[in-house]
Amino acid sequence: MIDTSSTVTSPFGVQKVGKGKSPVLPEEKDPSFNVRDRLNDVLLSEKHIIESYTTGSKEVLCQQLYNVVTENLSNLKLAQRHLFEELFNLGEYQADIAAQPQIDDALDMFTKYKVQLPYPQS
């Protein structure tokens, strides 16, 4: 699970949600294939596989095969999430902390976009 209460300060003083770099990861990127590279490589592969399964799930005619494909797709999404969480916990991913006005602006913008959708609003 991602701990969104963890914060770090960037070298330029910006507060971010995230963790500091793990000592497991090399300080500088180098030509060696390390833990970070392996996890990022697997994460990218999972993203491509998920896209293929998503397309396939929309085009399957047999209900039984559809059920298998969608179950596999669900499991792949969980695996991708776990990989992302692992990279987050190693300090590979961080996000800026948004102030309430920034959150309000984003919510307002997407609420306005929502009314443009051709789907019924709930």
Where are these regions (language model features)?
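Amphipathic alpha-helical hairpins
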Residues: 1-122
